[in-house]
Design a protein with these regions (language model features):
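Membrane-embedded helix bundles of polyisoprenyl
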Residues: 19, 109-122, 126-210, 225-245, ...
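Membrane-interface starts of transmembrane alpha-helices
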Residues: 7-14, 92-99, 103, 124-132
Length: 259
């Protein structure tokens, strides 16, 4: 009995071990540097070139501005806000192309562990949660979409949001939910925040009304608290959302202006 409890308690270690074995099998050529994990053109042309551009100009001392061209020129580094991008830059421009596989693997482990935590928080047995987490990160959707760096990040943030929602519902821990929403707003685009906000609302309605059987004032209290958390998160994100909204509505596609 004691041994089985220990196995159940530390089943997340088996998740990490199994993932490590599978990753060595699937990504060995990328890990040893024989091939570069720049599979899609978007990753090779957009993200890689953007990071190289940042490395070329980051030493000028003013963020978003470089004096390397004439009297100076602005550079948009707003898309490099995720902290793991800083991890990529630490290895320099010459080694940058070798780091993308590690960037991908870190996101895989984060997504798997967070999804595992979310499943166990829902009351699912830990061994079953291990299988669920493996299916989550080795699904066809994750593998295909991982060729674009931002898409794989969605899996991490979705798992974090699900875990944060359950922490709020079960432990009344609202801080983690605010962190999850803020990360969604800063690391992804505006429409991601809208889509996941609607999904969060639907999840809240279904969970509180059908699963916990909350009715009346208690039901609306939870809905109101979730709305308040969303408002606080949006206020924190105002510095990013307001310029993005203005840019969206002033674009030719939205304003119906032909270019």
């Amino acid at each position: 009995m004691k041994g089985s409890i220990l196995k159940e308690k530390y089943s997340w270690i088996w998740l990490v071990v199994l993932m490590t074995i599978l990753n060595l099998l699937f990504y060995w050529k990328f890990i040893i540097g024989k091939e570069f994990f720049l599979v899609s053109k978007d990753m090779a042309i957009q993200q890689y070139s953007s990071l190289v551009n940042w490395l070329n100009h980051i030493g000028d001392g003013i963020k978003g501005w470089s004096f390397s061209e004439g009297m100076g020129n602005s550079y948009d580094f707003s898309g490099q806000t995720f902290s793991l991008n800083i991890f990529l830059l630490l290895f320099g421009k010459e080694n940058l192309k070798y780091t993308f596989i590690w960037y991908h693997l870190i996101k895989m482990y984060l997504a798997a562990v967070l999804f595992y935590c979310a499943l166990t928080k829902l009351g699912i047995k830990q061994k079953v949660a291990v299988y669920g987490a493996l299916c989550y990160v080795y699904s066809a959707t994750f593998i295909v979409r991982s060729f674009w760096a931002s898409y794989a990040l969605e899996f991490v943030l979705f798992a974090l949001l699900l875990y944060a929602l359950e922490c709020y519902f079960q432990d009344n821990n609202w801080l983690l939910l605010v962190v999850a929403i803020v990360l969604l707003g800063t690391q992804l685009q505006l429409y991601h925040l809208v889509v996941y906000s609607v999904a969060m609302l639907c999840y809240t309605l279904i969970r509180n009304y059908l699963v916990t059987n909350y009715r009346g004032k208690k039901f609306w209290k939870y809905i109101g608290n979730c709305a308040l958390i969303m408002i606080v998160s949006v206020i924190i994100l105002a510095y990013r959302l307001i310029p993005e909204i203005m840019s969206t509505f002033s674009s030719g596609r939205v304003a119906n202006v032909s270019t």
